[in-house]
């Protein structure tokens, strides 16, 4: 039996069918000939699809593919994947795109048993995903030969497997944080996204404003041995590399760390299968400060504030001159710093001192700018009618190479009253016969360092000179030291009066020629003694002079029974062969705590009980070469426990501690409530000696307003330059300008918060006459209606519905005398005509679109029904008389968002 020929419609019908089928082109499924066949397989011949087949395939077409949402690129937040692995979803082959042929039917010629490669041969799972194993090869489908000589057809049942996966949020790993306070937590290590990588490598970058640092506190820390957390400070600027603050082994819960810059990095690494619960860290910004400037040798420094804007003022001891800037300012920056290098204090070699009242002459440092050979001459001149008293505070001269001469007068020819080559050092000092003294120092390469300190003071001729006691204090009954005045002497800790015992007072006698009835005593460091004060100092014999050989001194230190002794070695420089021994107990028979020889750096020693014994031994005989300066040891009693004393929180504030117990290294951070400022250091540290680094601060209510500032083209007057509560600031403008705003601002207090000004700072604007309101047009309105408009202000006009605006929509007030509008106000006229293009709006537009579309659809359905009847087939192609040989084709979408889903079967016959 031959195959009947296919009937074709006439040309006019074909033309109509082509025009009507254009609307279906976009939604047609792919044909089987677009799929790539398996290499080596036979390429089938596919017959051209007629209109019925195209319409049938479109009716069974699936919905659009669901792809990645916009902005779901996981790269900014996910951890870095291992080398060679990518997190981007691979593109799908054309044959696997949803909706591209879930059902294909075609006329199969005789002898063709296959329609192309099977679905498992075309669908390949993307890398890194798992998919069900492909089914076995499909059996060849024999052609069906219906009775009655009908056309041979092929029926296919396609099984579509849809894989569905719940899309999880990406793991927040790499992150830049700029808030002033918050929390940093480890990523959710149990999520699918984090398990898809072999190594989790996260960096959290926290940065705040310049001038602020970052303080972190570890609240939770539970990491496995394979996990690592690094805390780094700095970075982010050229030449500023991050500096490691701590790692996992150094961190603990409750620990507080501070970054000295405005940037801090947290670097976290975790294996593919983490075992710990991660970390939680609280961070907050704090105000950075400049470091405390170093105190110059022979001088001191006073600091108003270490925060930006604070000042450091330097000054030198008497007899020294300041070299450098006297005042430095703390400047704000990534790391606040002072405006310059700290100055130094140097002693000058010679000079003239006019109108001398009280001061010192000090020898220059050995080996300085003056070199080893010195020739220094000083002239000290007091006011008319006064004389000078010169006290020898410290003198150490080389007998062979140094010489000191003092003359009573102001020239080298004045009479000599002291010569070091011939006279001993006068204990009572020297008194000039005139109003001047001439001091000359000669030194030629001395074997020992030169030490010289002379104190001078001027006094009236009708009274005694003011007494002086080095390393001690003087109290008197008459500050003017007239005849009859008494002066009483006492020594500083570590010194004792010499000669010892009473009398420790002298009297000014003889009204005709006033003088003291006895010499001033001296305070000298003694060799040994018993000390039972809570705090004190132990000095080497004759300190600050060099000790002499043949010393064997023993000091006993005793404090309360429940205390122990902290000994701090400030200076230790003894000769070779000399030794200082410390015994942990009462007497030299106790356990040896330490033996100190030669030069030693600063160190601290702690006794186990309330007693400590010190023994210094210097063998007799000529001293070894070199000068033994001696030693200075400070001691004080401390508690026996290992914690610093408890400090209460400040009133109107609070404090936070880095540790629960106040152990060594604990940091206390103080803060005040709004409206209060902190007086003192905001950070206290428990030091090694179990004392706090500074006194606890206090919170003081802020009673001043911030400086409101000046105004342009004007000036101000303030009732108080400090702007306290209740003060006033009055503003005035220059001629030609007018004040906009309140002329007087008042600083008033608030219960909560800092004091505030009563109003904003005014402005000075050019003085012009305002423009009058031009009026509202009939059938219209204007915005911002008011009677007067200042120069530069604009006014907009609008018309009601049904009216059109004739003229300028916006007019502006132009400054002048008088000010004028840029144009006349517009008019609102009735709309005469309507634009035809605007009639097609709303429902009319929808009707214009939907009516032709509906006609096309109805016409297409009619053509389809007509064509179906013409071919003699049922309307929908269903037939109960056919037998089927189902072919199951399984498609596996290679989209990583889907896995393990549902299965659908479609059974179609044409």
Swiss-Prot record:
Compartments reported by the entry: Cell membrane; Endoplasmic reticulum membrane
SMART domains assigned to the protein according to its UniProt record, in alphabetical order: CCP, CUB
Gene transcribed to yield this protein: Sez6l2
Topology of this chain in the membrane: Single-pass type I membrane protein
Keyword annotations of the record: Cell membrane, Disulfide bond, Endoplasmic reticulum, Glycoprotein, Membrane, Repeat, Signal, Sushi, Transmembrane, Transmembrane helix
Bias kind Pro residues: ranges: 123-145
Regions of this protein lying in the Cytoplasmic compartment: 866-910
Function, in words: May contribute to specialized endoplasmic reticulum functions in neurons.
UniProt key word DNA repair: no
Stretch forming the signal peptide: 1-27
Domain of life: Eukaryota
Transmembrane segment boundaries: 845-865
Observed effect of gene inactivation: Mice lacking Sez6, Sez6l1, Sez6l2 exhibit motor discordination, and PCs are ofen innervated by multiple climbing fibers with different neuronal origins in the cerebellum.
Tissues where this protein is expressed: Expressed exclusively in the brain, predominantly in the neurons. Wide expression in the gray matter of the brain with high levels in the olfactory bulb, anterior olfactory nuclei, hippocampal formation and cerebellar cortex. Detected diffusely and weakly in the white matter, such as the corpus callosum and cerebellar medulla. In the cerebellar cortex, intensely expressed in Purkinje cells (PC) and granule cells. Detected also in interneurons in the molecular layer. Up-regulated at two weeks after birth.
Taxonomic lineage of the native organism: Eukaryota, Metazoa, Chordata, Craniata, Vertebrata
One record GO biological process: synapse maturation
A Gene Ontology cellular-component term: plasma membrane
SS bond list: 173-202, 290-330, 316-345, 349-376, 464-508, 491-523, 527-553, 644-686, 672-699, 705-747, 733-764, 771-813, 799-828
Protein name: Seizure 6-like protein 2
Stretches for region Disordered: 70-152
Glycosylation sites: 222, 332, 373, 473, 517
Cited Pfam families: CUB (PF00431), Sushi (PF00084)
Extracellular side: 28-844
Boundaries of every CUB domain copy: 173-286, 349-459, 527-638
Main location: membrane
């Amino acid at each position: 039996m031959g195959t009947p020929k296919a009937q074709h419609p006439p040309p006019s019908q074909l033309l109509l069918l082509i025009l009507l089928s254009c609307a279906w082109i976009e939604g047609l499924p792919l044909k089987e000939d677009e799929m790539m066949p398996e290499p080596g397989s036979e390429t089938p011949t596919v017959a051209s699809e007629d209109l019925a087949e195209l319409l049938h395939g479109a009716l069974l077409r699936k919905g659009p593919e669901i792809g990645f949402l916009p902005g779901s690129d996981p790269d900014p937040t996910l951890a870095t994947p291992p080398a060679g692995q990518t997190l981007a979803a691979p593109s799908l082959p054309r044959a696997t795109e949803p909706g591209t042929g879930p059902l294909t039917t075609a006329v199969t010629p005789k002898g063709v048993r296959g329609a192309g490669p099977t679905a498992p041969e075309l669908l390949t799972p993307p890398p890194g995903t798992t998919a069900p194993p492909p089914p076995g090869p499909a059996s060849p489908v024999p052609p069906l030969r219906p009775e009655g000589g009908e056309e041979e057809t092929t029926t296919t049942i396609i099984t579509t497997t849809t894989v569905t996966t719940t899309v999880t949020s990406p793991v927040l790993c790499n992150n830049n944080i700029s808030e002033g306070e918050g929390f940093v937590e480890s990523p959710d290590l149990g999520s699918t996204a984090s398990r898809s990588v072999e190594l989790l490598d996260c960096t959290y970058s926290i940065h705040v404003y310049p001038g602020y640092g970052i303080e972190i506190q570890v609240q939770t820390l539970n990491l496995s041995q394979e996990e690592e957390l690094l805390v780094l400070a700095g970075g982010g600027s050229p030449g500023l590399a991050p500096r490691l603050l701590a790692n996992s082994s150094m961190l603990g819960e409750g620990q507080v760390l501070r970054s000295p810059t405005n940037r801090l990095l947290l670097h976290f690494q975790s294996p593919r299968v983490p075992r710990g619960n991660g970390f939680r860290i609280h961070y907050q910004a704090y105000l950075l400060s400049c470091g405390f400037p170093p105190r110059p040798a022979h001088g001191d420094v006073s600091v108003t504030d270490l925060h930006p804007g604070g000042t450091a003022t330097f000054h030198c001891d008497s007899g020294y001159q300041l070299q450098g800037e006297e005042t430095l300012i703390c400047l704000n920056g990534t790391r606040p710093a002072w405006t310059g290098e700290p100055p130094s204090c140097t002693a000058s070699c010679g000079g003239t001192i006019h109108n001398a009242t009280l001061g010192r002459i000090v020898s220059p440092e050995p080996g300085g700018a003056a070199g080893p050979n010195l020739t220094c001459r000083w002239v000290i001149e007091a006011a008319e009618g006064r004389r000078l008293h010169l006290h020898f505070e410290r003198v150490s001269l080389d007998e062979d190479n140094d010489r000191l001469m003092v003359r009573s007068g102001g020239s080298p020819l004045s009479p000599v009253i002291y010569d070091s080559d011939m006279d001993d050092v006068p204990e009572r000092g020297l008194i000039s016969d005139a109003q001047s003294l001439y001091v000359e120092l000669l030194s030629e390469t001395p074997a020992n360092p030169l030490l010289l300190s002379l104190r001078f003071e001027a006094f009236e001729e009708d009274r005694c000179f003011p007494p002086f006691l080095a390393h001690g204090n003087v109290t008197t009954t008459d500050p003017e030291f007239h005849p009859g005045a008494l002066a009483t002497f006492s020594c500083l800790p570590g010194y004792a009066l010499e000669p010892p015992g009473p009398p420790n007072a002298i009297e000014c006698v003889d009204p005709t020629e006033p003088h003291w009835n006895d010499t001033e005593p001296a305070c000298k460091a003694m060799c040994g003694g018993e000390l039972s004060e809570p705090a004190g100092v132990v000095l080497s014999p004759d300190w600050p002079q060099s000790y002499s050989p043949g010393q064997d001194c023993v000091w006993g230190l005793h404090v309360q029974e429940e205390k122990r002794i902290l000994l701090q070695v400030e200076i230790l420089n003894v000769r070779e062969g000399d030794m200082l021994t410390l015994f942990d107990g009462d007497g030299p028979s106790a356990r040896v705590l330490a033996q100190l020889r030669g030069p030693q750096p600063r160190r601290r020693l702690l006794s186990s009980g309330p007693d400590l014994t010190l023994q210094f031994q210097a063998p007799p005989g000529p001293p070894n070469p070199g000068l033994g300066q001696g030693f200075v040891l400070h001691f004080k009693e401390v508690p026996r426990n290992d914690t610093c004393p408890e400090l209460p929180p400040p009133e109107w504030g609070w404090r936070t501690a880095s540790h629960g117990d106040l152990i060594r290294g604990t940091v206390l951070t103080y803060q005040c409530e709004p409206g209060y400022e902190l007086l003192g250091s905001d950070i206290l540290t428990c030091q090694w000696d179990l004392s706090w680094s500074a006194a606890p601060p206090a919170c003081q209510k802020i009673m001043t307003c911030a400086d409101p500032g000046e105004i342009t083209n004007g000036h101000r007057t303030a009732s108080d330059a400090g702007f306290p509560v209740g003060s006033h600031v009055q503003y005035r403008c220059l001629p030609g300008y007018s004040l906009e705003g309140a002329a007087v601002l008042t600083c008033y207090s608030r219960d909560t918060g800092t004091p505030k000004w009563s109003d904003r700072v005014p402005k000075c604007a050019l003085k012009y006459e305002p423009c009058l309101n031009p009026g509202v047009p009939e059938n219209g309105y204007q915005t911002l209606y008011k009677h007067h408009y200042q120069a530069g202000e604009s006014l907009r006009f609008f018309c009601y519905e049904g009216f059109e605006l004739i003229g300028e929509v916006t007019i502006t007030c132009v400054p002048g005398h008088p000010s004028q509008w840029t144009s006349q106000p517009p008019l609102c006229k009735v709309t005469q005509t309507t634009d035809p293009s605007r009639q097609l709006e709303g429902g009319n537009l929808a009707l214009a679109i939907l009516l032709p579309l509906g006609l096309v659809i109805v016409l297409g359905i009619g053509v389809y029904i007509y064509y179906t009847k013409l071919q003699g087939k049922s309307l929908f192609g269903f037939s109960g008389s056919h037998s089927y040989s189902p072919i199951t084709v399984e498609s596996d979408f290679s989209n990583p968002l889907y896995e393990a889903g549902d299965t659908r079967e479609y059974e179609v016959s044409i």
